[in-house]
C-alpha cells in the first residue's frame, strides 16, 4: 500500500461549531488531487457519511461537484461509508474507514452500504443531478487498471478538522502473480500486544 497524498485543514466559518462547510471539503479534496496529479482516478471513495440530516447532503454535494466532470455512467465513482454498516467509531472512524478502503482496493471488491434503506432526500437530489457518484447496496467489482487500485477516504472532526487521503494498493491478483503475500514479517506479529487480546490466539488474529 502506498499513500499518494493527504491533507488536513480546518473547515473555517460555518453555521455552527458542528456544521460542515462544503466549500472547504471540496477545496481539501481538490488539493490532494493536485498533489498526486489529475491523471490518477479513484476507484472508490470512503466518505465520512455519518448519516446526519445536515452533514451528508453537504458532503454529497461537494463530492458531486468535484467528480461531475471526471466520471460517467460507465465509470461512476463508488461511494460508501463504514458508518452505514457499523455506526460511528468516534476517534477511530477515520482509521477504520482507511482500513476498509485498503481491503476493498486489495480485493477489487466494493463493500455495499448494507444498511441503506432510503436516502436522505437532499443527498439523493444532489447525487441524482448526475451519474458521477453512486451508492452501491450490493457488493460489486471496482473499475480499475491492473495491477493497482486507487481510492480516497475522508474523515471530518467534530469541531471542524477535515482530512482526506488517497491511497494506492496492489490487488490480490497482482500480488499473487508477483509471488508476494500480505502476511507480516515474523518480527511484526507481536507489535500490537493490546490488539492480540481481542483474538483467541495470535495466529488467529493474523489469519
What are these regions (language model features)?
Residues 1-205:
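Condensing-enzyme catalytic core of the thiolase-fold
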